[in-house]
Design a protein with these regions (language model features):
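N-terminal Rossmann-like FAD-binding beta1-loop-alpha1 element of flavoenzymes
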Residues: 59-80
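Mobile, glycine-rich extracellular loop/lid and propeptide segments
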Residues: 66, 169, 196
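Conserved N-terminal/central alpha/beta ligand/cofactor-binding core
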Residues: 11, 74, 80-81, 86-179, ...
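Ligand-binding pocket scaffold of soluble enzyme catalytic domains
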Residues: 67, 96, 189-193
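Core beta-strand elements of the Rossmann-like FAD/NAD(P) dinucleotide-binding domain
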Residues: 55-57, 190-198
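Conserved beta-strand-loop-beta-strand element in the redox core of flavoprotein oxidoreductases
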Residues: 176-192
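Glycine-rich loop(s) and the adjacent beta-strand/alpha-helix scaffold that form part
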Residues: 201-228
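Extreme N-terminal leader/targeting segments of oxidoreductases
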Residues: 2-58
Length: 228
């Protein structure tokens, strides 16, 4: 096979794989036959199975973004056994994952933006960042190092006794009457269930609320640099 035929065959094969994932070639390799695409609407029946209950907690917080972080730390400090489910592998969500370094709305726009308007757990986090020179007042509001923010968020959770589960994607809830009694979680080990008395939905999309069947209003943000 010369170079021209090799390249021709390689391109055709790659195109077929990208299209359907299934490729058949004849013996001469002059033609490539691609199987027809699957039609939309087809379904596959998933066999029923019993889901193992692997843990339980007073409170399960779904999502490890800024809201989930604050909710988990606050609840754990009040003595609750807290499990935080984070589908990624760091805390902070879009704040740290997308390098949103500005602490918007934490400081008042008056008096050169140096009048603090937000306190509490966020203030504690900022104090840790500032003490390690990971907060820069290059303008108003200040900028923070997002990698350091991930670290200190986790540190505060661990100190409070929050049990963080990374790579854990909440996918459904189990209801007992009008109350959630368990959360189904997709993990690297498969689907598992975790029992709980309370759930705080910090998914960013209101997923848990939707799964319960409660009424909600769907609001779609315009795609922009502000709403990612």
């Amino acid at each position: 096979m010369d170079r021209r035929h090799f390249l021709k065959r390689s391109v055709a094969t790659a195109a077929g794989i990208a299209t359907t994932g299934v490729v058949a070639t004849d013996a001469s390799a002059k033609t490539v036959k691609v199987k027809t695409r699957l039609e939309y609407g087809q379904t596959i029946k998933e066999p029923s199975r019993r889901i193992p209950v692997v843990d339980s907690a007073d409170l399960i917080v779904v999502g490890g973004g800024p809201a989930g972080f604050a909710a988990s730390v606050a609840a754990a400090r009040q003595g609750l056994d807290v499990i935080m489910l984070e589908r990624g592998y760091f805390l902070g969500g879009l704040f740290t994952g997308c390098d949103v370094t500005l602490l918007n709305n934490m400081y008042s726009p008056t008096h050169n933006g140096r009048v603090q308007a937000v306190f509490g757990i966020c203030d504690e986090l900022c104090n840790r960042l500032d003490s390690h020179k990971m907060m820069v007042w290059a303008g108003t509001p200040p900028n923070v190092d997002t990698e350091a923010t991930k670290y200190f968020m986790e540190e505060m959770c661990v100190e409070a006794g929050v049990r963080i589960l990374y790579g854990a994607h909440a996918s459904e809830v189990s209801m007992s009457g009008d109350r959630i009694d368990a959360v189904f979680v997709e993990t690297k080990s498969g689907r598992v269930a975790m029992k709980t008395n309370f759930v705080i939905d910090c998914s960013g999309d209101g997923d848990v609320l939707a799964w319960t069947g409660e009424d909600f209003i769907e609001y779609k943000n315009h795609i922009s640099a502000m709403y990612r």
